[in-house]
């Protein structure tokens, strides 16, 4: 066996160990990051999302991608996470307000009045004739009608002016601001910190506390969930 053969075998084993260690690192760092406070490993809070330093492997929005020196989680150790956020929006609306204003208007009205009109009304009278002379004479009388003046009432109309007061509606518009919320879906991708070339492995049991301090949990137990 030559030296080149041993070097080739050593290179193959190192490559396999490197791939296994990298995969284990990606899986377990994702699991540990779920229950680890944000700045445990020395990363600033400006580069990470709102869900912690690893943020369930879904730290950043899709258009932004992973930050500089970070790399995507290709092994799909943790599923990407989508959530909905409500964005407040201000809108201006007009509200109709009705006020009542008192107004006085002068109107012309037709008022009936009683007046008197004099007319000639015929009345029956008697006219006596003289007796005729002779053996066959009789007394004759003739009745005729004579006109007299009589008073009769007649109704006429007269125009008068009156004042009328009433309430008039006046419409105005008042500007009000209304806040509405628009739902926006935020899609996250899987990102991991730039520790890709740290070739160490975690033990089978790692005691970590979650962000709320609810005690220690094992990484294997979390990963199985």
Swiss-Prot record:
Residues 1-21 form the signal peptide. GO terms for cellular component: extracellular region. Its main location: secreted. Prismatic layer of shell (at protein level). It is found in: Secreted. Keywords: Secreted, Signal. This is Uncharacterized shell protein 2. It comes from Margaritifera margaritifera (Freshwater pearl mussel).
